[in-house]
């Protein structure tokens, strides 16, 4: 978990996972002073539930993380979110490289840590996710490499965005998926052949 809103989502996820009976540990990297009110509230709730939180601030804690990763079945990545841009700080870079080296399934919240949500760019390294759970709408960075190759299976959670916002003309991005492609392809008769479908000239 990081100290931004993505970390707040991580604390909230921990609460729900604990309620489902899962054993878990949270390793925190960042600065508590940067907590938003929502992140602070979720962190406090997790503490009251007795869930372990370890701050990655000493060699001993890093060693504990390494051991915990060896025995973990899955890693939930809530270090960096859609607001990330620029270069990774060295401790975060070290964390991402460590998690990737373990080969454990990673579930990233919103976008794999280290991927720029608007472009899919990666400055140095980024989390290799098996699954990415994003909210509201997919991000451009989920579909442009190298971000696309790091996203894994993409799940989009409906959080009730107003339909008016989704219909804004200022939203210029359109995702060509199977459903949209089906509407664009005309129905063809069973006896169709190459001479009855028109001609295409490609200039490249």
Predicted regions span which residues?
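A cross-family phosphate/adenosyl-ligand binding-site feature
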Residues: 1-74, 80, 87-90, 148
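YjeF_N-associated NAD(P)HX repair module
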Residues: 69-203
